[in-house]
Design a protein with these regions (language model features):
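Surface-exposed, low-hydrophobicity beta-strand/loop segments enriched in small/polar/acidic residues
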Residues: 1-177
């Protein structure tokens, strides 16, 4: 038997009412988060209310990475300034917005030296981005109007924190609430 000591804290209320959830929850795949770094260290825990998507082949849920654009970028830009605390890493593919109407390309560098924002640099431009838009993880490099999400499964959100130091961590999953 293992004993784990943990400080208790209260998350701000994020789920007021559960209308539909995934019965039995789901297993969160942590392999996609290996290259997500915070203060130079790998992430050891996901907070609640994280978007995950189901891989129909394996049945595992993968985190759908996003980042809020913090400064407008021109149509020919390859560097995008985004808010801190995103989960992107070098090698991930991104597109602008969840409508998947833009192009997608590979992240070649992430500059985290500024205290206010991170700068994500891509191999080629994915188009103009307005402040407040969201960079969304994509499957691979695509031209405009051809970007795809990494998996074709249902999008849900986690209902509790997920310990990433443990393989095959379970989580309650909210479909509608």
């Amino acid at each position: 038997m293992y004993r784990k000591r943990e400080r208790e804290f209260q998350y701000p209320p994020g789920i007021e009412k559960i209308i539909e959830d995934v019965i039995g929850g789901g297993t969160i795949d942590r392999r996609d988060l290996r290259n997500a770094l915070f203060n130079g260290k790998s992430l050891d825990e996901l907070p609640p209310i994280v978007i995950v998507v189901k891989d129909p082949e394996t049945g595992l849920y993968h985190v759908l990475k996003t980042a809020l654009v913090s400064e407008a970028a021109a149509a020919d830009a390859t560097a995008y300034k985004v808010a801190k605390n995103h989960l992107f890493g070098v090698g991930d593919f991104v597109t602008i917005g969840g409508a998947l109407t833009g192009a997608s390309d590979k992240i070649t560098a992430i500059d985290k030296s500024n205290a206010e924002f991170d700068t994500i640099t891509l191999e080629a431009t994915i188009g103009a981005a307005a402040k407040g838009q969201v960079l969304v993880q994509a499957k691979d490099k695509q031209v405009a109007k051809a970007a795809k999400l990494p998996y074709d499964g249902e999008l849900v959100v986690t209902m509790n924190k997920v310990d990433l130091t443990v393989a095959n961590q379970q989580s309650g999953l909210l479909v509608r609430g």
